From Swiss-Prot:
Gene name in the database record: Srp68
A GO MF label: protein domain specific binding
Region described as Required for interaction with SRP72: 586-608
Function (record text): Component of the signal recognition particle (SRP) complex, a ribonucleoprotein complex that mediates the cotranslational targeting of secretory and membrane proteins to the endoplasmic reticulum (ER). The SRP complex interacts with the signal sequence in nascent secretory and membrane proteins and directs them to the membrane of the ER. The SRP complex targets the ribosome-nascent chain complex to the SRP receptor (SR), which is anchored in the ER, where SR compaction and GTPase rearrangement drive cotranslational protein translocation into the ER.
GO cellular component terms attached to this protein's record: cytosol; endoplasmic reticulum; focal adhesion; nucleolus; signal recognition particle, endoplasmic reticulum targeting
Stored CDD domains: SRP68-RBD
Annotated domain remarks: The N-terminus is required for RNA-binding.
Protein's UniProt name: Signal recognition particle subunit SRP68
Location of the region described as RNA-binding in the Swiss-Prot/TrEMBL record: 51-251
UniProt keyword annotation of Nucleus present: yes
One biological process term in Gene Ontology: response to xenobiotic stimulus
Residues bearing PTM Phosphoserine: S47, S240
Length: 625
């Protein structure tokens, strides 16, 4: 029997064959498939020892499945592709081991027994059975959102995966298998069992299985080097949200905070637990919303009777804290979008309640028309939250673009580098949002609010004007840029003079003093660049006679250095030659014709008249001469 290269630690051959096999399976090429079979048949140094039971069998279970999953579809969540890979790899292993299930016409079931454990590929065969069933279950889980009936099939495939994992664990209990493989098999079985109990919502059994899996992987991680422990620690991090979710459903109310932190760290949208986690957080906020009856904003308290608005306002502080603690810009942007989406939903709910309230206001007394209703004031508050969040998001994007602009990396053809025009557009949107804030109903008489918004408007106008000046510098319009820099200093000085009494409103805004320092340095650089550009333009004017595209044949009398004459594009003569004017052909007029005398024709006319009728008749009968 042909032996295969062993996988790491006595069993790397299975992992290697899987990666190579996946390439052939996905590519579909004949040569790739031949390479896979050759890899399965490659002999290993320890195969004879395994046959004689002198060495222990070893299989890096977690490493094999992680590498196979990343290389064959799971990086993009394509479980169907991974299931196809598992089937193809199973078929190759059975063919290599001569362990076929009958022939084309008849199926003969065979099970891997302890007596067959002469090669670690028999363990790999059972592992691929479990992985194939698990990947099919995960594929059905994705489809079960639109087709609930598929959930029954999902549970069936998970049970089958657990059955194969238990068979793998039973085989690994043999004395021929080393201790590390035994522990990995136990952890793998516990993980799949926990997944099955989790889907059945048997929270206590699920948390016991997940804790067992976590304990084994933590022990394995502490027993090996840091490089080998990375995979085990990653698996522990994957299991932790499931454990906390089960703990919450058992009755641990403190688990909800840890789940929200896990959602923040993971990005919130990845993993099969994401939907249940979002539903759990919404459900928890809904329970807390029952105790919330009013909200206070800018000295006025308004009742909150709409459940959707209550849920949004309760989660507002958590969302803002999550944005502050976000580690990456992608996570921060996603949280901003999520918060804006929730705010829009809350605003829509208030608008639906405002429609009948607006009809009642039409019949209200004129004396009461000066004060907006509580519902309208609540709408203004939610609009303020939405616009303020949009301003913060655009300001955060502008800071990122500004950092990229200052780095001045070389331009890449595949990725467009940021330009000052991009920042100008963002600050235009911010200023538009500030104008909308000034027009909110119920805040017309709030002088403090109006002053704060006016101050913020000056700050963002200064930054917008600064980047407009930067765009003029790029096209070497020095005078326009200098005027705009002066305008920036004017705005910044106004903010500094009026911002002393409103320091609280400026604490979240960009530093104006830093902008003033930067503008002053930019003005010095601009003036120096303008002087250099003037000298360059003067030199260009003096040398412009060389580059007037006059051919050499027309300027023999003047000497000038023209480097283009020694190139293949030398301008020597006009070719094709240009057209030159020539005299036209003269015109001749026959003026002598008027003075020519022609002979008389009277005698001929008389002869023709004499013939008359007789001549005509003779002509008919053919007697005319």
């Amino acid at each position: 029997m042909a032996a295969e290269k062993q996988i790491p630690g006595g069993g790397s051959g299975g992992g290697g064959s899987g990666s190579g096999g996946g390439g052939g399976g996905s590519g579909g090429g004949r040569s790739a498939g031949g390479d896979e079979n050759k890899e399965n048949e490659r002999p290993s140094a320890g195969s004879k020892a395994n046959k004689e039971f002198g060495d222990s069998l070893s299989l890096e279970i977690l490493q094999i499945i992680k590498e196979s999953q990343q290389q064959h579809g799971l990086r993009h969540g394509d479980f169907q592709r991974y299931r196809g890979y598992c089937s193809r790899r199973q078929r190759r292993l059975r063919k290599t081991l001569n362990f076929k299930m009958g022939n084309r016409h008849k199926f003969t079931g065979k099970k891997v027994t302890e007596e067959l454990l002469t090669d670690n590929r028999y363990l790999l065969l059972v592992l691929m059975d479990a992985e194939r069933a698990w990947s099919y279950a995960m594929q059905l889980k994705q489809e079960a959102n639109t087709e609930p009936r598929k959930r029954f099939h999902l549970l069936s495939r998970l049970r089958k995966a657990v059955k194969h994992a238990e068979e793998l664990e039973r085989l690994c209990e043999s004395n021929r298998v080393d201790a590390k493989t035994k522990l990995e098999a136990q952890a793998y079985t516990a993980y799949l069992s926990g997944m099955l109990r989790f889907e059945h919502q048997e929270w206590k059994s699920a948390i016991e299985a997940f804790n067992k899996c976590k304990t084994i992987y933590e022990k394995l991680a502490s027993a090996f080097t840091e490089e080998q422990a990375v995979l085990y620690n990653q698996r522990v991090e994957e299991i932790s949200p499931n454990i906390r979710y089960c703990a919450y459903n058992i009755g641990d109310q403190s688990a909800i905070n840890e789940l929200m932190q896990m959602r923040l760290r993971s990005g919130g949208t990845e993993g099969l637990l994401a939907e249940k986690l979002e539903a759990l957080i919404t459900q928890t906020r809904a329970k807390q919303a029952a105790t919330m009856s009013e909200v206070e904003w800018r000295g006025r308290t308004v009742p909150v009777k709409i459940d959707k608005v209550r849920i949004f306002l309760l989660g507002l502080a958590d969302n803002e804290a999550a944005i502050v603690q976000a580690e990456s810009e992608e996570t921060k942007e996603r949280l901003f979008e999520s918060m804006l989406s929730e705010c829009r939903d809350a605003l829509q709910a208030v608008r639906e309640e405002l429609k009948p309230d607006q009809k009642q206001r039409d019949y209200a007394l004129d004396g009461e028309s000066g004060k907006v209703s509580n519902l309208q004031y609540l709408h203004s508050y939610l609009t303020y939250i939405k616009l303020s969040t949009a301003i913060r998001r655009n300001e955060n994007m502008a800071k990122g673009l500004h950092r990229a602009l200052l780095q001045q990396q070389p331009e890449d053809d595949s990725k467009r580098s940021p330009r000052p025009q991009d920042l100008i557009r963002l600050y235009d949107i911010i200023l538009q949002n500030l104008v909308e804030l000034l027009q909110l109903p119920g805040l017309e008489e709030d002088r403090t609010f109006q002053k704060e918004i006016s101050l913020k408007t000056l700050v963002f106008k200064a930054y917008r004007c600064f980047f407009i000046a930067q765009s003029y510098v790029l096209v070497k319009k020095w005078s326009e840029a200098l005027v705009l820099y002066d305008r920036v200093l004017k705005y910044a000085n106004e903010v500094s003079s009026h911002g002393g009494a409103s320091k609280n409103s400026l604490k979240d805004l960009p530093d104006v003093q830093e902008l003033i320092t930067q503008v002053r340095s930019e003005k010095c650089s601009l003036q120096a660049a303008a002087i250099l550009d003037a000298n360059d333009s003067h030199q260009t004017d003096t040398s412009s006679q060389v580059k007037d595209n006059t051919p050499l044949v027309e300027r023999f009398e003047s000497f000038c250095l023209d480097p283009s004459l020694v190139t293949k594009q030398a301008n020597l003569v006009h070719f094709p030659p240009g057209f030159q004017p020539i005299p036209c052909k003269p015109l001749f007029f026959d003026l002598a014709l008027n003075h020519v005398a022609f002979p008389p024709l009277e005698d001929k006319l008389e002869q023709k008249t004499k013939s008359g009728l007789t001549g005509y008749i003779k002509g008919i009968f053919g007697f005319r001469s």
